[in-house]
């Protein structure tokens, strides 16, 4: 897997499925594809005075990931961890919600063997900007979108999800993802199945699909957890 794929991915895995809520939200998950993995743990904390889904929120994020790519010394194995903190503003209505956030992200990447020409290498601190939201389309259909950009590694990440609430507490749909940076780009499409039982404060989402990328096309799979607090 090219290093730019995961540079773009960690620009924005901080999904906000409850950005319109007054409660806080804990998030955790993992994704695996050919020659790469990604795991994360995050928290979204409402700011003071937030009411009816309108107001400030804070996002905190920790993640660990690995990937392989063909670099200057040959095949390179990368392992990294990252942390970020951001401040955002959200709003909501009867038909959906939206938010915008900005903050700092630190990533520490170890390469074996070392690749001095790599964009992602060592400790790097940069800005991260993100927009996201959801909108009801009617007839139990809901459209969600996320777009983000990370300055230091010049990475972008965007995802579109179309979900149908077929029964109480269950949704099925499709997702489309595009990400990359100056060095490479990738696209992916997959199926998403989400479960959030009525009157419960937790949710679980399963994802699977196929990714097209510069060096290693193949399937991917993932799982996401969310819990209000």
Predicted regions: what they are:
Residues 200-201, 206-214, 221-228:
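Long terminal segments
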Residues 155-188, 198:
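Intrinsically disordered, low-complexity segments enriched in Gly and acidic/Ser/Thr residues
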